[in-house]
Amino acid sequence: MELVLKDAQSALEVSETTFGREFNEALVHQVVVAYAAGARQGTRAQKTRSDVSGGGKKPWRQKGTGRARSGTIRSPIWVGGGVTFAARPQDHSQKVNKKMYRGAVKSILSELVRQDRLIVVEKFSVEAPKTQELKAKLKELDLKDVLIITEELDENLFLAARNLYKVDVRDVQGIDPVSLIAFDKVLVTAAAVKKIEESLT
């Protein structure tokens, strides 16, 4: 299959298995959820009765005071005591094998092509790290909410995009399923398309 280049009167030959496969919604959902889960910090913690300091001595004797029996001031029913079912640091990451990950990325790329959300250009860069220059270039292409993918990370482009709302710049190594679906359009260079194909085969 062919992808038409936006800035040239030509087309780029690409693999049908990478850019023309059927959309697998269940797989994409599973991989995106797993990817988002892996980004969770999971470092919250509370203290149980065994973690709270103090409470070694029995507050009063077992019998004869008229008060309810008590063995420690760190009991969960006491103010300043431990928490009954305390939160513990946990790892939320889910296992996603390479075949599933690649399948999900191919599925997303194919759907972007079908929805005319993938824009391929021969090259895309700015001469200086100036936000206004990049803004003008994106206006020419009528792009506002866009992920720009280049073969290698272009520092000028990266710096120029830092202060633009809903504009992100990634190299091929930096793309992931979440970023591909987070933007309205995906602008990718021809060299990056070839590199993406190589990485997914």
Swiss-Prot record:
GO terms for cellular component: ribonucleoprotein complex; ribosome. Part of the 50S ribosomal subunit. It comes from Psychromonas ingrahamii (strain DSM 17664 / CCUG 51855 / 37). One of the primary rRNA binding proteins, this protein initially binds near the 5'-end of the 23S rRNA. It is important during the early stages of 50S assembly. It makes multiple contacts with different domains of the 23S rRNA in the assembled 50S subunit and ribosome. One of its GO terms (biological process) is translation. This is Large ribosomal subunit protein uL4. The gene is rplD. Residues 43-71 are annotated as: Disordered. One of its GO terms (molecular function) is rRNA binding. Belongs to the universal ribosomal protein uL4 family. SUPFAM superfamilies: Ribosomal protein L4 (SSF52166). InterPro entries: Ribosomal_uL4, Ribosomal_uL4-like, Ribosomal_uL4_dom_sf. Keywords: Ribonucleoprotein, Ribosomal protein, RNA-binding, rRNA-binding.
